[in-house]
């Protein structure tokens, strides 16, 4: 339902994350087939792009399965997400993604945040040589987005998250139902428009 509702927003380029579970990116046959089904569903909903990633047990891009995912995406763009940063060799991984026909790779340069991996991101941009788009992401804010843009990346990903307090007036102190680690029971993650504007203003 969320995908269909998002598709109704005019002039929006819609990317859909395909990830069957949290944790690592080594998926079982059942999980892989779930990914194929979800890509088909995203296509039927009118998505412009799907975002996914799948690795082998030795920390390399699973080229065979990734090629199947790319083929399943049909005319949709395919972005390989930050599973890329978990590979044993990002330069080798980049070449693998080019071979299987990925449109784009999302990366923090193999570090926890893009600012930390900025030198590696710059190197990846050079190595890509226009064969695949490089998108920098993780830890992006108004104070560092210009530096990341200056690496020559094709795109920048950021979340601009904030916490919105619950409108509940009664808050049961005896039970935790929907709370997860790092997110209070009576709050939800939202988007901060001011943060988005501040980041975009740095790129003008």
Describe the predicted segments one by one:
Residues 23-41, 85-100, 124-130, 134-136, ...:
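Catalytic cores of alpha/beta
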Residues 47-103:
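Hydrophobic, well-structured mid-protein blocks that either form specific transmembrane helices
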Residues 41-59, 102-115, 151-173:
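Glycine-rich phosphate-binding active-site loops on the catalytic face of alpha/beta enzymes
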Residues 1-22, 61-82, 116-142, 177-204:
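Alpha-helix-loop-beta-strand connector modules within alpha/beta enzyme cores
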Residues 1, 27-29, 62-65, 91-93, ...:
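Short secondary-structure transition/capping segments
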Residues 31-34, 61, 88-89, 113-116, ...:
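Short secondary-structure boundary/capping elements
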Residues 1-3, 7-63:
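Active-site beta->alpha loop and helix N-cap motifs at the rims of alpha/beta catalytic domains
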Residues 31-33, 163-188:
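Short, flexible, glycine-rich and Lys/Arg-enriched loop motifs at helix boundaries
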């Amino acid at each position: 339902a969320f995908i269909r509702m998002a598709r109704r927003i005019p002039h929006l380029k819609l990317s859909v994350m395909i990830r069957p579970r949290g944790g690592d990116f080594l998926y079982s046959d059942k999980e892989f087939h779930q990914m194929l089904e979800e890509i088909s569903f995203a296509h039927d909903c009118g998505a412009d792009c799907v975002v996914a990633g799948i690795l082998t047990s030795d920390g390399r891009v699973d080229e065979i399965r990734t090629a199947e995912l790319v083929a399943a995406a049909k005319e949709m763009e395919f972005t390989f997400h930050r599973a890329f940063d978990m590979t044993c060799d990002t330069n080798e991984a980049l070449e693998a993604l080019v071979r299987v026909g990925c449109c784009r790779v999302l990366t923090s340069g193999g570090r926890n945040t893009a600012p930390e991996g900025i030198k590696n991101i710059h190197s990846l941009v050079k190595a890509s040589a226009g064969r695949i788009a490089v998108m920098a992401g993780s830890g992006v804010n108004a104070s560092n987005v210009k530096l990341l843009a200056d690496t020559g990346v094709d795109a920048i990903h950021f979340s601009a998250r904030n916490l919105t307090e619950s409108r509940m007036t009664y808050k049961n102190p005896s039970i935790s139902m929907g709370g997860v680690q790092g997110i209070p029971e009576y709050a939800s993650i939202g988007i901060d428009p001011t943060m988005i504007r501040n980041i975009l203003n740095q790129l003008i």
